[in-house]
Every structure is written in structure tokens, then in C-alpha cells.
Curated annotation (Swiss-Prot):
Modified residues (N6-acetyllysine): K69, K212, K217, K259, K271, K279, K301
Binding site for FAD: 158-167, 191-193, 306-308, 316-317, 374-378, 401-405
Binding site for octanoyl-CoA: S167, D278, R281, E401
Record's protein name: Medium-chain specific acyl-CoA dehydrogenase, mitochondrial
Protein localization: Mitochondrion matrix
InterPro entries linked to this entry: Acyl-CoA_dehydrogenase (IPR050741), Acyl-CoA_DH_CS (IPR006089), Acyl-CoA_Oxase/DH_mid-dom (IPR006091), Acyl-CoA_Oxase/DH_mid-dom_sf (IPR046373), AcylCo_DH-like_C (IPR036250), AcylCo_DH/oxidase_C (IPR009075), AcylCoA_DH/ox_N (IPR013786), AcylCoA_DH/ox_N_sf (IPR037069)
């Protein structure tokens, strides 16, 4: 098996270097008019999906429970994912990356999340941290900070949330004061994924001291090296689920950042920070679908083996109907993230679809994890079976990268604006 997997890796890396890149340039991703809608994946997409699936089932699943128990950061798995080309997929080709689209990243993310969403979140945390630079960085910034991530398995982090500012991003208190050719950063961030493992951070700070300044002018986005003096990394938080993911608070005390590390310019940070979500929320939704699919598979497997009242569980209509509902929900959630990803890869603004996908898939992941525990009964409540972990892991999909309630606000706003305009 090891030899076979090794050959698969070499083949995939070959595809990554040649065929995949040639097939997925921006020019080639443009669809010819009149071709209609298609559910068919390209051969390269199938290769990436199959490799991620094999990796999740053969390397992640066997150790997921132990990582959940210890809370240890899954360094060997992250290194392996990097070797397979399953990380940093958004990084442009001119920076050494594959330059893949959001749809491609979603296919990989779903498979990784099927194995363990803690591992998937650590990897997706990288994508979120990178995205502001991908969409707003200049050539020098991209080559310096994105390029290094293709040379070795480094991590980065999206450093925005604060103790008193989660959904209310405009309420952040971290300040950036310009002094000569550098900025002095002071403030505190919280719930930062990869916070203790990152090589660098995307940081959002208030650069306009006027409290009445509009959000689209009051904040500036920075790239901050993690080893800069004045950065104090807090303890690893013990969370309800996704425990192998690294989540921390970070204090910035008189941290000096050169002006060369500003994205676009003063006051552009809020737009940059929010713009990243159109590309990352579909990928988060795909992770939620991966968890939901795992819950459905575990529940179905159990129902085909367990007997009660002289019958298999699947022979009881109550259980078969539950499985049918679960199957319908996971299929619809998958379609939602694929639509959102397809829209942004086609060059269109996808805020509406990205929020639908994020909210719907997050809710479905929680519903299916709960139903899986119910079908397994007492066994589902026990750590000997994987569904209790799925139930704990699922909750964060309704919280991070925009709560389900915030997504509904966005969907409502976009929907109403269509009719007004």
C-alpha cells in the first residue's frame, strides 16, 4: 500500500507541475458561451479529489481521535498534505503555487474535512491568511510572503477577531500609528486559527483615530512577521471541537511594521479583509459538507449492522426516513458551495451565494451530526464511535468566518437590494 501511495504522490506532483497548471490558467478557466451547465469534473479535478480522499481515509482518519484527545497540532499530517500539493492551492503560479480556483480548493477541502475538520481548519486557516495578499498584495509582497510557503510547509494566520469584536469587525480596537516609514501596532487579537504556528499574520488595525470615521476608510491591513519583537502569543485554547487546530489570543505591544507591509494603502484594510471571504467561505462550506457526509456514512454503516426488535435499523421506516433526509440535505449543501465557488471562479461577485453556502452547509453539518448520534443511540454518545466528535466539531461551522446569523443578514441585504435596484 505504501509503495502504491508513493507512486500516486509522484504522479500527482507531476500533474501539479505540468498538466494541472496548463489546464487551469485564468484564460483556460473562462467558459465558452452557450456550453450550458455541467456537473462533470475535469480529469485533473478528479485526480486532486481522489488524492485528498485517499489521504483523508488512509492517513487522517486512523489518527484523528488521538489528535482530538491530545489536542496536539498535526504537524506530520500538515507536512504530508503540503507534500501532496493539497495546501496553499490558491497561491499564484508566479509565486511558485498552483494558482487553482476556489472550486478546486473546495473539492480538496471537503475530502480533508471528511477525515478530520481540525486538520482541514488548520489548512483552510492558511488559505484565509493568504487571501488578502492574493487579492490585494503587490508583486513584491506576494513573492516574499506567498513564495516562501511553496518552499516549505509554513503556516500563516488571519489576525482580525478581538475579544470585543467578532461579528462586528468595525468595532476592533487594535491601533496602528504611523511614525516615519513604519507603523506602531498596539492591541489584542483573539480566536486566531494557527495563531501559535504562523510564520506571518495578516493583521487588521484601526489607522484613523477618529471614532466616527467610516469603516471603509478607518482600517489598514498589514503583513506582520510572527517573530517581530512585541508580539506575545497566548496559550492554546481548549475548544469544544476541532481540538488539534491551533487557536490562540495574540497581544501586539509596540510592534513595528514597515510601510512596505501595508496592503494597498492607508484605509484600505476593511475592504481587503472582507473581500477575502468571497473566496474562502465556499471552502469553509465545503468543509462542513465533508463533515456532514462523514456523519451520513457513519450512521448508514451502523444502521446496516445494528439490529433492534429483530430487524436491522434500516428496516425501520423511522430510521430509513432519517437517512433519506440526511442524504437530501448533504446533496443540497454540496450544491450550494459548488455554486458559490463556480460564481467566483467565473469572475462574478459571489457574496450572495457564498453566504448562502456558508450558512446552509454549517447548519446541515450540525443537523446531520446530531442525527448520526441519535441513530447510534448510546454508542453515538461514546468516544469509541466517531460521531460524538463530529457533533462537537460541527458547531464551529456556524460561528467562524462569519456566524450563521451574519450570513443571513448578508443574504437578506443582497436579496432585497436586487429588488430595489
Amino acid at each position: 500500500m505504501a509503495a502504491g501511495f508513493g507512486r500516486c504522490c509522484r504522479v500527482l506532483r507531476s500533474i501539479s507541475r505540468f498538466h494541472w497548471r496548463s489546464q487551469h490558467t485564468k484564460a483556460n478557466r473562462q467558459r465558452e458561451p452557450g456550453l450550458g451547465f455541467s456537473f462533470e469534473f475535469t480529469e485533473q479535478q478528479k485526480e486532486f479529489q481522489a488524492t485528498a480522499r485517499k489521504f483523508a481515509r488512509e492517513e487522517i482518519i486512523p489518527v484523528a481521535a488521538e489528535y482530538d484527545k491530545t489536542g496536539e497540532y498535526p504537524v506530520p499530517l500538515i507536512r504530508r498534505a503540503w507534500e501532496l500539493g493539497l495546501m496553499n492551492t490558491h497561491i499564484p503560479e508566479n509565486c511558485g503555487g498552483l494558482g487553482l480556483g476556489t472550486f478546486d480548493a473546495c473539492l480538496i477541502s471537503e475530502e480533508l474535512a471528511y477525515g478530520c475538520t481540525g486538520v482541514q481548519t488548520a489548512i483552510e486557516g492558511n488559505s484565509l491568511g493568504q487571501m488578502p495578499i492574493i487579492i490585494a498584495g503587490n508583486d513584491q509582497q506576494k513573492k516574499k510572503y506567498l513564495g516562501r510557503m511553496t518552499e516549505e510547509p509554513l503556516m500563516c494566520a488571519y489576525c482580525v477577531t478581538e475579544p470585543g469584536a467578532g461579528s462586528d469587525v468595525a468595532g476592533i480596537k487594535t491601533k496602528a500609528e504611523k511614525k516615519g516609514d513604519e507603523y506602531i501596532i498596539n492591541g489584542q487579537k483573539m480566536w486566531i486559527t494557527n495563531g501559535g504556528k504562523a510564520n506571518w499574520y495578516f493583521l487588521l488595525a484601526r489607522s484613523d483615530p477618529d471614532p466616527k470615521a467610516p469603516a471603509n476608510k478607518a482600517f489598514t491591513g498589514f503583513i506582520v512577521e510572527a517573530d517581530t519583537p512585541g508580539i506575545q502569543i497566548g496559550r492554546k485554547e481548549l475548544n469544544m471541537g476541532q481540538r488539534c487546530s491551533d487557536t490562540r489570543g495574540i497581544v501586539f505591544e509596540d510592534v513595528k511594521v514597515p510601510k512596505e507591509n501595508v496592503l494597498i494603502g492607508d484605509g484600505a484594510g476593511f475592504k481587503v479583509a472582507m473581500g477575502a471571504f468571497d473566496k474562502t467561505r465556499p471552502v469553509v462550506a465545503a468543509g462542513a459538507v465533508g463533515l456532514a457526509q462523514r456523519a451520513l456514512d457513519e450512521a448508514t454503516k451502523y444502521a446496516l449492522e445494528r439490529k433492534t426488535f429483530g430487524k436491522l435499523l434500516v428496516e425501520h421506516q423511522a430510521i430509513s426516513f432519517m437517512l433519506a433526509e440526511m442524504a437530501m440535505k448533504v446533496e443540497l449543501a454540496r450544491m450550494s458551495y459548488q455554486r458559490a465557488a463556480w460564481e467566483v471562479d467565473s469572475g462574478r461577485r459571489n457574496t450572495y451565494y457564498a453566504s448562502i453556502a456558508k450558512a446552509f452547509a454549517g447548519d446541515i453539518a450540525n443537523q446531520l451530526a446530531t442525527d448520526a448520534v441519535q441513530i447510534l443511540g448510546g454508542n453515538g454518545f461514546n468516544t469509541e464511535y466517531p460521531v460524538e466528535k463530529l457533533m462537537r466539531d460541527a458547531k464551529i461551522y456556524q460561528i467562524y468566518e462569519g456566524t450563521s446569523q451574519i450570513q443571513r443578514l448578508i443574504v437578506a441585504r443582497e436579496h432585497i437590494d436586487k429588488y430595489k435596484n
